[in-house]
Amino acid sequence: MARHLAVTGEEDPCSLYLRDILFGKLPGYKCHRHKLNHLGQAKGILRGGNMAVFHGLRGTPYDIPPEGTILFIEDVGERPYAIERMMYNLKLGGVLEKLSGLIIGQFTEYKEDYSLKKDLYSTLDALVKEYDFPICYDFPVGHVTENLPLINGAEVEFVSGKKGVELLINPPI
């Protein structure tokens, strides 16, 4: 987010959202519907971030507890097979089945690996299609120009609907 501020300036919409958060005004985000989204709604604690960093914390005291979590993931510069492997780690480790929701953000600075026979989002979708919780793809978070600020540990309401995605950040109790 710091790089984002330096590159886009303080009047950029994402910078304004960050300023609002810092001054106690919590945003609600709405974005487009992706064709792979899984419809549904959930409440939970927003946790996540960079997939490689998150993966490196697995099995440590800093690992994210999956129960009641709406997990968001993004990454930069990782190869698709590495992202697939990290997602398999979450699946086989029992993390995915305990989530309340999954927000798949932007994966940038990589080249599609056509040996996987499908694009990255389709590869990830094959690993999560069995779950009942809401899932959205292409959420504007990550190392991108439209990088919405998210609050790790915030209670959120997440809706993946036919007309789009909504993420509401609730005030702390």
Q: Can you name each region flagged by the protein language model?
A:
Residues 1-57:
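Conserved anion/nucleotide-ligand pocket segment
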Residues 9-13, 45, 49-52, 78-85, ...:
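Conserved active-site and cofactor/substrate-binding residues in soluble primary-metabolism enzymes
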Residues 25-33, 63-68, 97:
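Short, structured loop/turn "capping" segments at alpha-beta junctions
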Residues 38-39, 46, 63-65, 95-96, ...:
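Solvent-exposed alpha-helices and their adjacent loops that cap or buttress functional pockets
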Residues 45-76:
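Conserved beta-alpha junction segments in alpha/beta enzyme cores
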Residues 54, 102, 153-156:
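Buried hydrophobic positions in well-ordered alpha/beta secondary-structure cores of metabolic enzymes
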Residues 65-119:
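Internal helical hairpin/lid segments
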Residues 109-173:
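ATP/nucleoside-binding phosphotransfer catalytic cores, i.e., glycine-rich phosphate-binding loops
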